[in-house]
Swiss-Prot record:
GO terms for cellular component: membrane. Pfam families: GMC_oxred_C (PF05199), GMC_oxred_N (PF00732). One of its GO terms (biological process) is glycine betaine biosynthetic process from choline. Its EC number is 1.1.99.1, 1.2.1.8. The active site is at 470 (proton acceptor). Keywords: FAD, Flavoprotein, NAD, Oxidoreductase. Belongs to the GMC oxidoreductase family. FAD binds at residues 6-35. It catalyses: choline + A = betaine aldehyde + AH2; betaine aldehyde + NAD(+) + H2O = glycine betaine + NADH + 2 H(+). Its cofactor is FAD. It is an enzyme of class 1 (oxidoreductase). It comes from Vibrio vulnificus (strain CMCP6). Pathway: Amine and polyamine biosynthesis; betaine biosynthesis via choline pathway; betaine aldehyde from choline (cytochrome c reductase route): step 1/1. This is Oxygen-dependent choline dehydrogenase.
Length: 560
């Protein structure tokens, strides 16, 4: 096995596959990519409708869980992370949401210089191949294919949800990834010709064809090799043997918001007290490693449907077989979508400059494991506040890489977070009570009409909320004078040369949306920084903000 490479990347996930492609693209640099998981060539990964299977599989995901969460009455929440080529982009719901422009301006305000929306937009566009073609906001010839699924044609509930939002006084948006995020409209997904567009399919497939690129699967990286606070390589276990490889230029951790923290701390980089408690000799005291952890929470807001038109009628094995057969033969139909084809982004209160609540609409009433919630037909929205104040941490518990780290999000630990949930439940109920839903809406399944007061909502949320699987921000970028900043504005680990982190852990704050799209964008921009390329020129495109955001929660008046 070759032992020396220009760049060593740990983790073939949403960011790592992008870096593998971009760093090897010129042919001038040798690149090694190490991945703990295996192949992504499974129908359960590649067929979009099968999304619940890989996420709950030991084969394809690290099945982490949180420590007992005090403000969720001691519940431990599921926290799966991808362990397969493509990482979490191979097990996620394929929803493509960049985030609001103001999220990235907020990053720069938090000390991540050069990461404002104007600087990030060109990299979102470079990554993307939008099915409707290039425009000022969307990319038309990038590796990552995005589309709108079946464009809401297979179920009238998608359009009814958008109409209900308009009747409730909210705007409609034709492209939440473009000029206007706020409002109700069609949802976008990472699917190409009916197949999941993971970063493995989009980026890694290109790198694999190059002689200067090497991929090793089934590898658990034990630690980063350091010499006098300089990263020189990695030590990893392969088929039961410890091996080493060395990096002439840089080591890059793209192991995710849990994995990158774990790797840095196992290597002696992190809060001194955490390292010593775990039995790891501190090499570099960096107190922010593992801190600032953030996530999105969500609930399933469910109703019976009065018409037999929902996906609940397709959950028997015979129907699943027909859907699978059509997909295998044509890559079309219900198998070719994640079923989230309409959505919304709204503000929960006046005075918010940009949305803090996100809706995914699903024409079915399901449980978290993908099974039916009840007998009969129903529909649901996945909903939750997306800009939490609560902050958590990730900490190793021993020097053994096989031991899962301690994960504590401190969910709902602030009064603002709890109030956002009360607002969220009440606003959702109001939206779904609009006339556009009358012909479909039956009895409210959950939360249920008996959940109405602050105390009732608080308790129901505690008992029913789940993670949206968006852990992030645990190795944040920040300014030189921020003692908790793990990275500088070029994703370089502070105090250690030739070492970067590039994944969702670098976010200073969690954006209003799913994480795959911004993670890919970060990797695209980081690749240019690593290669010392001139960054793409900033793009000064206009962004819609509600004209009366300072004084009004929405732009219109509800019909009901």
């Amino acid at each position: 096995m070759q032992q020396h490479y220009d760049y060593i990347i740990v983790g073939a996930g949403s960011a790592g596959c992008v870096l593998a492609d971009r760093l090897s693209e010129s042919g001038d640099h040798s690149v090694l990519l190490l991945e703990a998981g295996g192949s992504d060539k499974s129908i359960f990964i590649q067929m979009p409708t099968a999304l619940s299977y890989p996420m709950n599989s030991e084969k394809y995901a690290w099945q982490f869980e949180t420590d007992a969460e005090a403000d969720l009455d001691g519940r431990r929440l599921h926290c799966p992370r991808g362990k397969v080529l493509g990482g979490s982009s191979s097990i996620n719901g394929m929803v493509y949401v960049r985030g609001h422009a103001c999220d990235f301006d907020e990053w720069e305000e938090q000390g991540a210089k050069g990461w404002n929306y104007q600087a990030c937009l060109p990299y979102f566009r470079r990554a993307e191949n939008w099915i409707d073609g290039e425009d000022e906001y969307r990319g038309g010839d990038g590796p990552l294919s995005t589309c709108a699924g079946n464009k809401m044609t297979l179920n009238p509930l998608y359009r009814a949800f958008i109409d209900a939002g308009k009747e409730a006084g909210y705007p409609e948006t034709s492209d939440y990834n473009g000029y206007q995020q706020e409002g109700f409209g069609p949802m976008h997904m990472t699917v190409k010709n009916g197949v999941r567009a993971s970063t493995s399919n989009a980026y890694l497939s290109r790198a694999k064809k190059r002689s200067n690129f090497k991929l090793i699967k089934g590898v658990v990286v034990q630690r980063i090799l350091l010499e006098e606070k300089r990263a020189v390589g990695v030590e990893f276990e392969l088929a039961g043997e410890l091996r080493t490889c060395f990096a002439k230029n840089e080591v890059i951790s793209s192991a995710g918001s849990i994995g990158s923290v774990q790797l840095l701390q196992l290597s002696g980089i992190g809060p001194k007290t955490v390292l010593e408690k775990a039995g790891v000799t501190p090499v570099h005291h960096l107190p922010g490693v593992g801190q600032n952890l953030q996530d999105h929470l969500e609930v399933y807001f469910q109703y019976h449907c009065q018409k037999p038109i929902t996906l609940n009628g397709k959950l028997d094995w015979f129907s699943k077989g027909l859907i699978g057969a059509e997909w295998i033969l044509t890559r079309k139909g219900l198998g070719a979508t994640n079923h989230f084809e309409s959505c919304a982004f709204i503000r929960s209160r006046a005075g918010l400059k940009w949305p803090n609540i996100q809706y995914h609409f699903l024409p079915a009433a399901m449980r978290y494991d993908g099974q039916a919630a009840f007998d009969g037909h129903g529909f649901q929205v996945h909903v939750g506040p997306n800009k939490p104040e609560s902050r958590g941490r990730v900490e190793i518990v021993s020097a053994n890489p096989s031991d899962k780290p301690k994960i504590q999000f401190n969910y709902l630990s602030t009064e603002r977070d709890r109030q956002d949930w009360r607002d969220c439940i009440r606003l959702t109920r109001e939206i779904l009570a609009q006339p556009a839903m009358d012909e479909f809406r039956g009895e409210e399944i959950q939360p249920g009409i008996n959940v109405a007061t602050d105390a009732e909502i608080d308790q129901w949320v505690k008992e029913n909320v789940e993670s949206a699987y968006h852990p992030s921000c645990s190795c944040k970028m920040g300014a030189d004078d921020d003692p908790m900043a793990v990275l500088d504005e070029e994703c370089r680990v502070r105090g250690i040369t030739n070492l970067r982190v590039v994944d969702s852990s670098v976010f200073p704050t969690i954006p209003n949306g799913n994480l795959n799209a911004p993670t890919i964008m970060v990797a695209e921009r980081a690749a240019d920084l690593i290669l010392h390329k001139q960054p793409l020129p900033p793009q000064r495109s206009k962004v819609w903000l509600a004209p009366s955001w300072e004084t009004q929660q929405r732009t219109g008046e509800p019909m009901r």
